[in-house]
From Swiss-Prot:
This is Xylose import ATP-binding protein XylG. It is found in: Cell inner membrane. Keywords: ATP-binding, Cell inner membrane, Cell membrane, Membrane, Nucleotide-binding, Repeat, Sugar transport, Translocase, Transport. It comes from Burkholderia cenocepacia (strain HI2424). Residues 6-245, 262-507 form the ABC transporter domain.
Length: 519
């Protein structure tokens, strides 16, 4: 067995006296891919920030050895010089710069006199992409011209340009399509063959099983186990992550489906940058009280834009006819939608769901502050009572209600956003990718909440790129393709193949909506 490239022993990191890491061990060998698994808040990101120098030596206890010698990094530059490079879940690219400029950002090739040698950077960037067998990216084009999948590949090329010996991938496929994920996994396998080690952090355990040689599981800041992937099953990994078995991920509860509460007709949205292009093209559907409607489709199909249009949040030109309980609505903003009884948990919680500068509690009450106002002042005691009640009801885990929401795990941030929207007492709740970047334990909690809301008569629209999630939750499934409604199916014996078939059909061949959506 080869000598370890990296050894972390007894890593302890505390914040305000509370241990986020409590004696964590991690070993990685050259050419090995180690899966790092744990629930949101388990300490995975904190451990990687220790390793990558975000938390410098001296701010944590324990030992890190790199290539057999102690590593005492004072910052990220030190670890990158050593060959440790992290690719964060939120990509660190500058959209306006070219692909080549991003690959060399902070590591530019210069000419005598200090001017940048753009020709050399373009040539080397092209070489790096060829090494990764990527031929679909023009290095002279701005990064903004490429989607999330290509941007992830650009980040990998950027890491290799820093001569990475250990590549840390933090939820690398969270915004990728299935085909883009396959390309990513092929690249990870190729890097392993070249001797590059990887730490692969993901809640998608099928990906962990596909590329990882060993798996390290941490829970509540402690090391649980490190075992060869060949000896593990996904159920076993989940049990180690959460400390219990999750037997029924989709606990379908009987719920009565009533009359139509929301009716949407002829939604059409124009592209923000090209008004001749339609992002949503004449979509009509309805949702009944207590019904869970899943919305499926390929990335870029227009699902999010459709939901934004209903919620009054679409940034471009949009036309639609919307009625609630038979009464016409005029929705020009999210505030109008909330007043009408429509709430939405957005796809990108960090940009549109939370205010990172505020605490957890103030994020939760943000949409209903008027409820606590009296004579121009906020009743802080009443607000705090509500915050504590909602945090307990949705199991939002935070040391105290005023802790910065930015410091919480993705799962706890998502539950805080849900709490905020539920305080508006909606009749219709739109959930756009509600479990993206959320661990399996938090997923189960969110699913239970969805079924509980349906039992209370709330109409739910759940947009998801995960077809098992759509099939596990929905009473009915809408399929969107190229901005059009390609299918409307009752979820009885429905398969993933049927959904994908509808999504991929050319518009003129797409099936007409079934009677499932008839009012």
């Amino acid at each position: 067995m080869t000598e370890p490239l990296l050894t972390m022993r007894g890593i302890v990191k505390a914040f305000d006296g509370v241990k986020a890491l409590d004696g964590i061990d991690l070993t990685v060998r050259p050419g090995e891919c180690v899966g790092l698994c744990g629930e949101n808040g388990a300490g995975k990101s904190t451990l990687m920030k220790v390793l990558s120098g975000v938390y410098p030596h001296g701010t944590w206890d324990g030992e890190i050895r790199w290539e057999g010698a102690p590593l005492a990094a004072s910052g990220v530059r030190d670890t990158e010089r050593a060959g440790i490079v992290i690719i964060h879940q939120e990509l660190m690219l500058v959209p306006e710069l070219s692909v080549a400029e991003n690959i060399f950002l902070g590591n530019e090739i210069t000419l005598p006199g200090g001017r940048m040698n753009f020709a050399a950077m373009v040539q080397r960037a092209e070489e790096l992409l060829r090494e990764l067998r990527i031929d679909t990216i023009n290095v002279a084009q701005p990064v903004m011209n490429y989607g999330g999948g290509h941007q992830q590949l650009i980040e990998i090329a950027k890491a290799l340009n820093k001569h990475a010996k250990l590549l840390i991938l933090d939820e690398p496929s969270s915004s990728l399509s299935a085909s883009e994920t396959r390309i990513l996994l092929d690249i990870v396998r190729d890097l392993k063959r070249r001797g590059v080690a990887c730490v692969y952090i993901s809640h998608k355990l099928d990906e962990v099983a596909a590329v990882c040689d060993t798996v390290t599981v941490i829970r509540d800041g402690r090391h649980v186990a490190t075992e060869p992937m060949a000896t593990l099953t996904t159920d076993r990994i989940i049990a180690m992550m959460v400390g219990r078995e999750i037997r029924d991920l989709y606990p379908r509860e009987p719920h009565e489906i009533g009359d139509v509460v929301l009716d949407v007709r002829h939604v059409t949205c124009r592209d923000v940058t090209n008004a001749r292009r339609k992002r949503v093209d004449d979509v009509s559907f309805s949702v009944r009280r207590g019904e869970i409607v899943g919305v499926a489709g390929l990335v870029g199909a227009g699902r999010t834009e459709l939901m934004q249009a209903i919620f009054g949040a679409y940034p471009g030109a949009c036309t639609a006819s919307v009625t609630m309980n038979g009464k016409p609505l005029s929705i020009r903003s999210p505030a109008d939608a909330i007043r009408a009884g429509i709430a939405m948990v957005p796809e990108d919680r960090k940009r549109h769901g939370i205010v990172p500068q505020l605490g957890v509690g103030h994020n939760i009450t943000l949409a209903v502050l008027r409820r606590f106002a009296a004579r121009g002042r906020i009743d802080a005691a009443a607000e705090l009572d509500t915050i504590r009640t909602e945090m307990q009801r949705l199991s939002v885990r935070a040391a105290h209600p005023f802790l910065s929401i930015a410091s919480l795990s993705g799962g706890n941030q998502q539950k805080a956003v849900l709490a905020k929207m539920l305080l508006t007492e909606p009749q219709v709740l739109i959930l756009d990718e509600p479990t993206r970047g959320v661990d399996v334990g938090a997923k189960a909690e969110i699913y239970r909440l969805i079924f509980a809301l349906a039992q209370r008569g709330v109409a739910l629209i759940v947009v998801s790129s995960e077809l098992p999630e759509v099939l596990g939750l929905a009473d009915r499934v809408l399929v969107i393709g190229e901005g059009e409604l390609r299918g409307d199916f009752v979820n009885q014996g429905l398969t993933q193949e049927q959904i994908l078939g509808a999504a991929l059909k050319p518009a003129r061949l797409a099936a007409e909506p079934t009677a499932a959506s008839a009012t």
